[in-house]
A protein has these predicted regions:
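Glycine-rich flexible loops
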Residues: 1-198
Length: 198
């Protein structure tokens, strides 16, 4: 089991990777993990660029918002993360991106056009109903879209990927972006065929 120090560094490393891969831009997006036995969430701070973020900048807080350790404010989306941890007992990491292709401005489900969608994500990528950013409702609205899935899009907002740990959540965010990109390209030249089963 990783220490809190190691998890903080992993959040920084994966956030920087997401920044370089285009899943984050500026200070948008956020990542967290949850240590259930300690009731402790580690989350990226708000308004800090990922290319200058350090492990000590990661904020430790309870799901009720009580900051346990940290000199910066937690991500403005901490309530969304908390709602997902409360509603999904198998989830220990949440990754919220503003990726370029997996957008949700059209409020549509992204069909499972790649095998990865079935194998790793659980099927098509549903779109959660809109809620005001920074509110718990963003996370609550995501729960139905996450049922049986490892990620969803958030209407007019971005992507939410989850996993048992940070590595899984990050990988699922990459798969969501890949499926969305291939679907968008395929849709521009014809009608993509959705996979219903392996």
């Amino acid at each position: 089991m990783k220490t809190i120090t190691e998890l903080r560094q992993e959040i920084v490393d994966r956030s920087l990777q997401a920044f370089h891969e285009g899943l984050f831009s500026g200070t948008s997006g956020n990542m967290s993990c949850y240590l259930r036995e300690e009731d402790l969430m580690l989350i990226t701070p708000t308004s800090v660029r990922y290319d200058v973020m350090r492990a000590e900048d990661i904020v430790a807080l309870r799901l009720d918002g009580t900051v346990v350790e940290g000199h910066l404010k937690p991500s403005s989306e901490w309530r969304m993360h908390a709602a997902v941890y409360e509603g999904c007992p198998d989830v220990n990491a949440v990754f919220h991106t503003h990726s370029p292709t997996a957008f949700a401005v059209n409020h549509q489900t992204i069909p499972a056009v790649l095998i990865e969608a079935l194998v790793f994500l659980g099927g098509d990528i549903r779109c959660a109903d809109y809620a005001t950013p920074g509110t718990k409702e963003v996370g609550l609205n995501a729960l139905p879209a996450l049922e049986g899935r490892k990620g969803c899009t958030l209407a007019n907002h971005g992507v939410l990927a989850v996993g048992g740990d940070l590595a899984q959540a990050y990988l699922n965010a990459e798969y969501i972006e890949d499926v969305a990109r291939i679907y968008a390209i395929a849709h521009s030249v014809g009608t993509p065929v959705e996979l219903k089963s392996l």
